[in-house]
Structures are given as C-alpha cells and as structure tokens.
Swiss-Prot record:
This is Hemoglobin subunit alpha. The gene is HBA. Heterotetramer of two alpha chains and two beta chains. It holds the Pfam family Globin. The modification Phosphothreonine is found at residues 108, 134, 137. PANTHER family: HEMOGLOBIN FAMILY MEMBER (PTHR11442), HEMOGLOBIN SUBUNIT ALPHA (PTHR11442:SF48). PROSITE patterns: GLOBIN. It comes from Felis catus (Cat). Involved in oxygen transport from the lung to the various peripheral tissues.
C-alpha cells in the first residue's frame, strides 16, 4: 500500500520527468531487452535495435500508461483495467517481465535524476511500480 509520503514522492518525481517520459520509457525497454533477453520474445515484429522507432513508440506507450497510473494512484485497478486485460488475455505476457521492466525503469530514472533519486524516492517508486505490476497481473488468476 502506498503511503501519503510515497504518493507525494512519486508525483514529485514524475513531475520532474515531464517531457522526457517517452524517452525514458524507451531507454528502460532497451535496458530490459539487453538485460533480460527473453523479454524480446514478445516483440518478434519489432526492430529492437538501439534507437528503433518501434521501441521509442512502445516506450511512449509505457510512459503514457505510467503517467495515467500516477494520476490515478488511488484507484489503479480501474485506471489500468484495459491494459491489464490486454496483457493478460491478448498478449499473455509472463508476469515476471513487469518486474524486469520496473527494475530497468528505476535504473533509468536513477541515471537521469541522481540528485532526486534519494533512498526514500527509490523506495516509493519501487512500491509504485510494484503496485502497477500487481494490477497488470491481477487478471491472470
């Protein structure tokens, strides 16, 4: 459960990301593909090379979904319902991949915002990404 402090930390951090959200989403995807090669199996139709337009576009989708989640932290299940359905029923993404992407998002944010990435912010973002992952995998059961 996200505390009031966690929500405040996440909103403040996400606010600083601003127009870079799509760029960071793409970078996190690239990190995920490099660090966890099995994740590539869900994107056989993508050009997965560095700077690929397809990876950038999907990175923007990830960022947009997270921006929506930040805006609706008090009701993630409703806000993420359609995305949960998509990943569970159509794409059938292995739930562990959300953890991999979450880790790579944390690394990406820490690289770009080291001064703001305090232990408290790190913990809050980790809890937030975990909450989003839990919602995205809730329909698997």
């Amino acid at each position: 459960v996200l505390s009031a402090a966690d929500k405040s930390n996440v909103k403040a951090c996400w606010g600083k990301i601003g127009s870079h959200a799509g760029e960071y989403g793409a970078e996190a995807l690239e990190r995920t593909f490099c660090s966890f090669p099995t994740t590539k199996t869900y994107f056989p139709h993508f050009d997965l090379s560095h700077g690929s337009a397809q990876v950038k576009a999907h990175g923007q989708k990830v960022a947009d979904a997270l921006t929506q989640a930040v805006a609706h932290m008090d009701d993630l299940p409703t806000a993420m319902s359609a995305l949960s359905d998509l990943h569970a029923y159509k794409l059938r993404v292995d739930p562990v991949n959300f953890k991999f992407l979450s880790h790579c998002l944390l690394v990406t944010l820490a690289c770009h915002h080291p001064a703001e990435f305090t232990p408290a912010v790190h913990a809050s973002l980790d809890k937030f990404f975990s909450a989003v992952s839990t919602v995205l995998t809730s329909k698997y059961r």
